[in-house]
């Protein structure tokens, strides 16, 4: 154990950060696979609620270790908006994962970087030049390529895009709140509000989970928390410009999980469109992190 720890610490920050981020993409993909499996048994609103609830429970020890004084805030309304947008994003994200192939849901989720560009320009006064406009149009073309064989946008596709837009809004809220509040404060209020918000639609479609479903719900939530933790650790030790492209390996893991667990085989147009979206998103992330990096490490799928 000691030798393994020394070997790990002897690696460069880039290597350690890359390992953490790659591990997070694997765990997020497994979480999505369990969510999709649960979605065939219970409603997506119920799956989203338990993900939010157990996520809140799992982060409580970390939050309270920082002390209750760290939960004070002078911007409760902004926390409320951030939590509501986050809760809506969780519900949309789980609906998309359950009703779309996992690879498609993952690829459409990456469009959050494209939504972030105009939002950051409007709310954070960041640059919005011709090159970034072209990048957004390229990403939109990728979305159209993915949906063309289906004869248009499915409802689940629109929900996936809405989730990406909501996540982009959450990132803006995080950027504004992080200047005055601690990470523990951000995580606590966002998790609590998201759990309360998702509880309402969950009650409308409630179905008592079986013993197996309870185990799957707990495992899914634990995977989400572990993935989030790995993601944060990765970005804590290495630069975002190096790590951000690695996040897109999630598409490969999601495609593998979809194939082996559900028999989903990505079509040629879907993979081509996903490649365009990923390329456009990588360009946005690289230009964003060179100017004003804004990452939301507290909102998981």
Question: Model-found features: residue ranges?
Answer:
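C-terminal transmembrane-helix exit sites in multi-pass transporters
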Residues: 95, 112-134, 205, 252-271
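Transmembrane alpha-helical segments that form core, pore/gating elements
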Residues: 33-36, 44, 59, 150-209, ...
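C-terminal-most transmembrane helix of multi-pass membrane proteins
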Residues: 2, 7, 252-301
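Specific transmembrane alpha-helical segments of multi-pass solute transporters/efflux pumps
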Residues: 27-30, 68-103, 145, 222-237
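Hydrophobic/small/kink-forming positions within alpha-helical transmembrane segments
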Residues: 25-33, 60, 83, 87-91, ...
């Amino acid at each position: 154990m000691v030798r393994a720890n020394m070997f790990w610490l002897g690696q460069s920050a880039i290597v350690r950060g890359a390992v953490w981020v790659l591990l997070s993409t694997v765990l997020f993909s497994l979480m999505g696979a369990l969510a999709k499996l649960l979605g065939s048994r219970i409603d997506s609103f119920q799956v989203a609620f338990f993900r939010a609830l157990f996520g809140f429970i799992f982060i409580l020890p970390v939050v309270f270790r920082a002390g209750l004084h760290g939960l004070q805030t002078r911007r409760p309304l902004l926390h409320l908006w951030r939590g509501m947008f986050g809760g809506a994003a969780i519900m949309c994200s789980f609906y998309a994962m359950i009703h779309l192939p996992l690879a498609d849901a993952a690829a459409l989720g990456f469009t959050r970087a494209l939504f972030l560009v105009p939002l950051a320009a409007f709310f954070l006064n960041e640059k919005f030049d011709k090159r970034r406009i072209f990048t957004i149009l390229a990403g939109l073309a990728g979305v159209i390529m993915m949906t063309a064989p289906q004869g248009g946008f499915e409802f689940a596709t629109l929900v996936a895009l809405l989730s990406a837009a909501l996540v982009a809004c959450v990132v803006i809220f995080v950027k504004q709140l992080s200047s005055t509040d601690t990470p523990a404060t951000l995580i606590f209020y966002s998790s609590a509000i998201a759990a309360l918000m998702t509880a309402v639609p969950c009650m409308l479609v409630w179905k008592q989970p079986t013993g197996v479903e309870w185990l799957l719900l707990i495992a899914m939530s634990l995977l989400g928390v572990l993935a989030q933790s790995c993601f944060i650790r990765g970005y804590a030790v290495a630069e975002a410009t190096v790590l951000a492209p690695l996040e897109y390996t999630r598409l490969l893991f999601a495609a593998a999980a979809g194939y082996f667990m559900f028999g989903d085989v990505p079509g040629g147009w879907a993979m081509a469109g996903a490649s365009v979206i990923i390329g456009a998103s990588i360009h946005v992330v690289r230009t964003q992190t060179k100017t004003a990096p804004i990452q939301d490490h507290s909102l998981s799928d």
